[in-house]
């Protein structure tokens, strides 16, 4: 069968759209339906139309048919019943992967070549100040290390691995498989040496032939000033042991900066919220402001409003890129008193009158109000 017969059955061209194919199918299906068409051969043509539409209406099967004909579409390259399942989780997995598997495209890698070990991750908590100024920390963790008994060979001391008797050191085996396209050859990992190309007759008693053993490991980490949560530091060669004499993997230290009770931070800028009284805001004052670099004095000008922000230059965190120091932003929050004594209330009333404010004078406190205030102060 040529690669256009299915299209011919539906009466469409090879570049027909899915809508065109669907319309043609409905037309041809109705034309040859056994309940409508009683001519000899109509039933077979109806089945042929169904077969063609089943393939061409599926984009994956259609692609297989266009390239390989009916054998490709019906043979199950898409992982269907009776086909080669598992190439791409059930879908039409791509011919590059399929032919790589059959013709040994992935088997050219030398199984005995040195291979780097796996990378590891380690999370480190930093205080707010440690993140600002930098710190050196020692981290401890377990990792797969080269076996100290066999030095990574996997063989008992005094012995050595030998060439695999099945794959003869290649680490792979060649298998012929019958497919709808004919006989195909593929390479698979050797089931004796598991790809290493070597057999261990007498395994090491410490690592049981793996060449690796779990070991406790410590390493010092220099954390630069100005780091933030989520940033990573890579320590080369501090991961897990390699294979066939390959290098160790790397350790990635992931940083987590703990919150501060006083400050907030975004990049090199530190934020601080300053509570002041309304008299300080109205009359002005000089107050001490905490910073990560020590306390500094800040002049609050008379008439300062809530939300006013002052900048303390150079009192922030270091800039990781470009150098220099960030600033600290101080935002004012004017605190309104919730309780007033008689003298304070009278003073405020006098202030309101002097300001020309029209307001209802609050009712003077009675005996029970004074008792309630006294109990709250206890």
UniProtKB/Swiss-Prot annotation:
<keyword id="KW-0143">Chaperone</keyword>
<dbReference type="GO" id="GO:0051082">
    <property type="term" value="F:unfolded protein binding"/>
</dbReference>
<keyword id="KW-0235">DNA replication</keyword>
<comment type="function">
    <text>Participates actively in the response to hyperosmotic and heat shock by preventing the aggregation of stress-denatured proteins and by disaggregating proteins, also in an autonomous, DnaK-independent fashion. Unfolded proteins bind initially to DnaJ; upon interaction with the DnaJ-bound protein, DnaK hydrolyzes its bound ATP, resulting in the formation of a stable complex. GrpE releases ADP from DnaK; ATP binding to DnaK triggers the release of the substrate protein, thus completing the reaction cycle.</text>
</comment>
<dbReference type="InterPro" id="IPR001305">
    <property type="entry name" value="HSP_DnaJ_Cys-rich_dom"/>
</dbReference>
<dbReference type="InterPro" id="IPR012724">
    <property type="entry name" value="DnaJ"/>
</dbReference>
<dbReference type="GO" id="GO:0009408">
    <property type="term" value="P:response to heat"/>
</dbReference>
<dbReference type="InterPro" id="IPR002939">
    <property type="entry name" value="DnaJ_C"/>
</dbReference>
<feature type="binding site">
    <location>
        <position position="147"/>
    </location>
    <ligand>
        <name>Zn(2+) 1</name>
    </ligand>
</feature>
<dbReference type="GO" id="GO:0005524">
    <property type="term" value="F:ATP binding"/>
</dbReference>
<comment type="subunit">
    <text>Homodimer.</text>
</comment>
<dbReference type="Pfam" id="PF01556">
    <property type="entry name" value="DnaJ_C"/>
</dbReference>
<keyword id="KW-0346">Stress response</keyword>
<dbReference type="Pfam" id="PF00226">
    <property type="entry name" value="DnaJ"/>
</dbReference>
<dbReference type="GO" id="GO:0031072">
    <property type="term" value="F:heat shock protein binding"/>
</dbReference>
<dbReference type="Pfam" id="PF00684">
    <property type="entry name" value="DnaJ_CXXCXGXG"/>
</dbReference>
<dbReference type="InterPro" id="IPR018253">
    <property type="entry name" value="DnaJ_domain_CS"/>
</dbReference>
<dbReference type="InterPro" id="IPR036869">
    <property type="entry name" value="J_dom_sf"/>
</dbReference>
<feature type="binding site">
    <location>
        <position position="207"/>
    </location>
    <ligand>
        <name>Zn(2+) 1</name>
    </ligand>
</feature>
<dbReference type="InterPro" id="IPR001623">
    <property type="entry name" value="DnaJ_domain"/>
</dbReference>
<dbReference type="GO" id="GO:0005737">
    <property type="term" value="C:cytoplasm"/>
</dbReference>
<feature type="binding site">
    <location>
        <position position="193"/>
    </location>
    <ligand>
        <name>Zn(2+) 2</name>
    </ligand>
</feature>
<keyword id="KW-0862">Zinc</keyword>
<keyword id="KW-0963">Cytoplasm</keyword>
<keyword id="KW-0677">Repeat</keyword>
<dbReference type="GO" id="GO:0008270">
    <property type="term" value="F:zinc ion binding"/>
</dbReference>
<feature type="repeat" description="CXXCXGXG motif">
    <location>
        <begin position="147"/>
        <end position="154"/>
    </location>
</feature>
<dbReference type="InterPro" id="IPR008971">
    <property type="entry name" value="HSP40/DnaJ_pept-bd"/>
</dbReference>
<feature type="binding site">
    <location>
        <position position="164"/>
    </location>
    <ligand>
        <name>Zn(2+) 2</name>
    </ligand>
</feature>
<feature type="repeat" description="CXXCXGXG motif">
    <location>
        <begin position="164"/>
        <end position="171"/>
    </location>
</feature>
<dbReference type="InterPro" id="IPR036410">
    <property type="entry name" value="HSP_DnaJ_Cys-rich_dom_sf"/>
</dbReference>
<keyword id="KW-0863">Zinc-finger</keyword>
<feature type="binding site">
    <location>
        <position position="150"/>
    </location>
    <ligand>
        <name>Zn(2+) 1</name>
    </ligand>
</feature>
<feature type="binding site">
    <location>
        <position position="204"/>
    </location>
    <ligand>
        <name>Zn(2+) 1</name>
    </ligand>
</feature>
<keyword id="KW-0479">Metal-binding</keyword>
<feature type="binding site">
    <location>
        <position position="167"/>
    </location>
    <ligand>
        <name>Zn(2+) 2</name>
    </ligand>
</feature>
<dbReference type="GO" id="GO:0042026">
    <property type="term" value="P:protein refolding"/>
</dbReference>
<feature type="domain" description="J">
    <location>
        <begin position="5"/>
        <end position="69"/>
    </location>
</feature>
<dbReference type="GO" id="GO:0006260">
    <property type="term" value="P:DNA replication"/>
</dbReference>
<protein>
    <recommendedName>
        <fullName>Chaperone protein DnaJ</fullName>
    </recommendedName>
</protein>
<dbReference type="GO" id="GO:0051085">
    <property type="term" value="P:chaperone cofactor-dependent protein refolding"/>
</dbReference>
<comment type="similarity">
    <text>Belongs to the DnaJ family.</text>
</comment>
């Amino acid at each position: 069968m040529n690669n256009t017969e299915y299209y011919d059955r539906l009466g469409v061209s090879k570049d027909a759209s899915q809508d065109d194919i669907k319309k043609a199918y409905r037309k041809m299906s109705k034309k040859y339906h056994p309940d409508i068409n009683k001519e000899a051969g109509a039933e077979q043509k109806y089945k042929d139309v169904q077969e063609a539409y089943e393939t061409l209406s599926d984009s994956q099967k259609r692609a297989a048919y266009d390239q390989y004909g009916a054998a490709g579409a019906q043979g199950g390259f898409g992982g269907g019943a009776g086909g080669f399942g598992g190439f791409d989780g059930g879908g039409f997995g791509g011919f590059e992967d399929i032919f790589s598997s059959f013709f040994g495209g992935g088997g050219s890698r030398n199984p005995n070549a040195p291979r780097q070990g796996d990378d590891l991750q380690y999370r480190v908590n930093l205080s707010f100040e440690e993140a600002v100024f930098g710190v050196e920390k020692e981290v401890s963790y377990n990792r797969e290390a080269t076996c100290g008994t066999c030095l990574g060979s996997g063989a008992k001391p005094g012995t050595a691995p030998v060439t695999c008797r099945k794959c003869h050191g290649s680490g792979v085996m060649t298998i012929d498989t019958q497919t709808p396209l004919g006989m195909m050859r593929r390479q698979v990992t050797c089931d004796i040496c598991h790809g290493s190309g070597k057999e261990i007759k007498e395994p090491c008693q410490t690592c049981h032939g793996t060449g690796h053993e779990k070991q406790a490991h410590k390493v010092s980490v220099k954390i630069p000033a100005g780091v933030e949560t989520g940033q990573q530091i890579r320590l080369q060669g501090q991961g897990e042991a390699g294979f066939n004499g390959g290098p160790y993997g790397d350790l990635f230290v992931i940083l987590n900066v703990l919150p501060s009770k006083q400050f907030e931070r975004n990049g090199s800028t530190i934020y601080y919220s300053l509570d002041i009284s309304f008299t300080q805001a109205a009359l002005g004052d000089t107050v001490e402001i905490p910073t990560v670099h020590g306390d500094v004095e800040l002049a609050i000008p008379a008439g300062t409003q809530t939300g006013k922000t002052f900048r303390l230059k150079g009192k922030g965190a270091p800039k990781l890129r470009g150098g220099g120091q960030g600033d600290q932003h101080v935002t004012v929050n004017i605190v309104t008193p919730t309780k007033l004594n008689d003298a304070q209330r009278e003073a405020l009333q006098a202030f309101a009158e002097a300001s020309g404010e029209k307001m209802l004078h609050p009712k003077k406190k009675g005996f029970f109000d004074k008792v309630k205030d006294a109990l709250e102060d206890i």
